[in-house]
A protein has these predicted regions:
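Divalent metal-cofactor coordination and adjacent catalytic microenvironments
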Residues: 1-96
Length: 96
């Protein structure tokens, strides 16, 4: 896992018991990153970890898909980070 449940809850500032939803979002974010880059990353890769946290937070905050559009700023950051992970990442052990 790129991100633990506790890390994700702290990142999105959730005190309640939404563990099942957040765990599902973490798994979905990891799969999204894998499909976008074709690579599997470990927690040692800080860029991948941060991208996972961004995705989990965005999806959690916009999980109802009603109302405001998702932040365009977040979308731009996500696209940029995916490109960096896809083309600029070396072997996992080298990235700390």
């Amino acid at each position: 896992m790129l991100v633990t449940l506790e890390e994700a809850k702290e990142w999105i500032r959730v005190d309640g018991d939404d563990d099942q939803t957040i765990t599902m979002l973490i798994k979905a974010a990891e799969l999204y990153i894998y499909k976008a880059t074709g690579k599997t990353f470990t927690q040692a890769n800080e860029d991948a970890k941060l991208l996972c946290l961004f995705l989990v937070a965005d999806w959690y905050e916009n999980r109802l898909l009603v109302g405001e559009k998702a932040s365009e700023k977040i979308r731009t950051i996500v696209q940029s980070m995916i490109l960096q992970l896809q083309y600029a990442s070396g072997p996992q052990e080298e990235r700390k």
